[in-house]
A protein has these predicted regions:
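Non-catalytic tandem-repeat scaffold regions and their flanking low-complexity/translocation tails
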Residues: 2-145
Length: 145
């Protein structure tokens, strides 16, 4: 009874996360994060490394990483934004920034697969469910070649 009670406590109320559309997953699997591929990526990688290391507090590191995520998105560098987001220490900030990346990626069919990358990094089933619904709906609207 105790085992069943523990299982129910942990699993009831958690939404079942719908899968991403298979076509979106297939396209996302062709994307790779390689911040060493170009000078801009190298600078972003270096900035992310500097922001996430050292003797600063977690809040300070998270603030620097959050700023880099926003900067990366402004530059159209979803790869760097995803890398920086998963390094955030605060779970709520991480989930929020990953959802921000997913929403930003969903604005354009060409960047939509980066939203799948962001959703994969999410740990909160509720946030991940919202992201999957958004990404799947947007994927269905995108023209196919």
């Amino acid at each position: 009874v105790a085992v069943l009670g523990t299982w129910l406590w942990r699993n009831l109320g958690k939404p079942e996360v719908p899968p991403l559309e298979p076509g979106l997953v297939t396209v996302a699997q062709t994307y790779h994060i390689d911040l060493e591929a170009d000078p801009e990526g190298k600078l972003l990688r270096e900035s992310i490394t500097n922001a996430s290391t050292g003797f600063a507090t977690h809040d300070s590191k998270d603030a620097r990483l959050a700023a880099l995520i926003d900067k990366s998105l402004d530059m159209g560098r979803f790869d760097a934004a995803c890398v920086a987001a998963v390094l955030l220490f605060d779970q709520h900030k991480r989930e929020g920034k990953l959802m921000h990346i997913a929403r930003s990626a969903a604005k354009d069919c060409a960047t939509l697969p980066w939203g799948a990358f962001a959703a994969k990094g999410m740990k909160d089933p509720g946030v991940q469910t919202d992201a999957h619904f958004l990404l799947n709906a947007r994927w269905r609207e995108c023209p196919r070649p």
